[in-house]
Amino acid sequence: MDEITLKALAKINLGLDVVRRREDGYHEVRMIMQTIHLYDLLEIQKIREPEIQIVSNLSFLPVNENNLVYKAARLLQEEFALTDGISVKLTKRIPVAAGMAGGSTDAAAMLYAMNQLYDLGLSRSELMKRGVQIGADVPYCLMRGTALAEGIGEKLTQLPPMIKCPVLIAKPSISVSTRFVYQNLKLDEQTNHPDIDALMKDIREKDFDGVCAHMGNVLESVTIPNYPVIAEIKQQMMRSGAKASMMSGSGPTVFGLFEDGETAKRALREMKRSGLAKQVYLTTIYNNRRK
């Protein structure tokens, strides 16, 4: 095999709680991660030149060692002394710096692709151990589906699949620094923690109303006061018929869950007309796990 094309799927957080701040500055979390059917496309092939070549449809995206795809390729090249080079055509559809693990899922796809291209024989768990060296979300992006993430996000427990439903994605034209969000999170003053255990119970019992009732993201306590448009997008989604709406990760992307496709399509049109978000997509929950 000399070439492979893969979809790198985005994630949302159905629940995100921060447990504590560690002495090393990292925060320990409890999150429910969920894959959705919004994806980047990676067309990967071996080349004779001993280098990593990346081209992208986004001119502002780094295509050097600052790109997680590059880091993933370099990691396996060095570990297995691979002499071939790699060429990657990366077509981005997942919003960048949006709280949807766009860079991490691309890196996960790269690890998976190189394992196939070079017949390295690494299991999914072995790939996940290497993935955490690139980023905390990479192991989950290798796993996919519905999962509880703990620690800094790298300790994963697979959960039963989430009920499939339409998902509306809206990213406003603002940038939110993950570091800023976590640095300004006042855990000692935080009283509104999402009930992650209740959320897991709802998922296991296929209780869609329960999932919607127990969704929550503790990081909204920082982002919404600083970026009111996030709250405005949530309100717009709820007015348009969403059963629940929440910010994903550290933002600024907001998503809404819907019971039926027609309501979701109408909400898509209304969100576009509102002008609140620069990027708007209608997709669905995706439950196929990577083997």
List PLM regions with ranges:
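Residues embedded in well-ordered beta-strands within globular domains across many folds
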Residues: 43, 87-89, 246, 281-284
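ATP-dependent small-molecule kinase catalytic core of the GHMP/sugar-kinase superfamily
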Residues: 2-7, 15-17, 21-31, 120-244, ...
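Short, basic/glycine-rich phosphate-binding loops at helix/coil junctions
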Residues: 48-62, 110, 205-215
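ATP-binding N-lobe of GHMP and related small-molecule kinases
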Residues: 1-98, 116, 120-128, 134, ...
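A generic structural signal for short
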Residues: 61, 99, 221-222, 256
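Glycine/serine-rich anion-binding loops at beta->alpha junctions
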Residues: 89-118, 136, 243-258
